[in-house]
Amino acid sequence: KYLKNFESIGVKVLLSKAPDFAGRANLNYQILSTMKGLEEGEKLGCEYAIKTRTDQRFYSTNLSRDLFNLLKIYPPSPNYNMHSRLIALSFNSFKYRYYGISDMFLFGNTQDMLKYWNSPLDTKKYEEYKTIKQKDLWQQYCSETYIASHFLKNIGVTPEFTLKHTWKIYKDLFIFIDKEILDMYWPKYTNLDSRWRLFRPNMLEEMRHSDWLNLYLNDDFFIKEDIELLIPNIGEN
């Protein structure tokens, strides 16, 4: 009934077969459903696409204009085979996580989006993850890093899993925008607007637009080696 209501207002609803194995944090569900939506958009001739969550809302009345204007201002680096940059959200894009681009929102050329989300399904069983140190889980095996690192492989870039390379990729291929630009609303877990902000260096500090702009404008802005100490040294065994 509800799906037909959506279709009656011109929304195309796609149904996907559930994966045989969900993957860590239901990663395989996200990969399959996102790829199916992007592939359908490509068939329909959609040149650009937005990936969002159904439990989040964006109230900005200038959303599409703002996103397209950003792509006009910041062309992609010529060193990569990309139609345009990908616009990522500061929210849940943690500054000190390797390739930690939030998987909640992404906007860009549909061909580039297909490259970004075309990851192999996660086949690691939960028992295998138990043997991985917590630090490595946070830096290399979370959903965001898994997807982004496979995207790099899809465009011929070998992930180095360092902060310096992570920030170079951000500088060259992405634009990070603050969630306030989208007027984002997401009441899950908490209704606080700034759930991660502590206003001091910390592991949950997000990659905000001002941080990205500093990266974009200044090659020497890359972090010093000693900032690696911020990476948590927990779960050692």
Residue map of PLM features:
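ER/Golgi luminal nucleotide-sugar-dependent glycosyltransferases, focusing on the catalytic module
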Residues: 1-52, 56-237
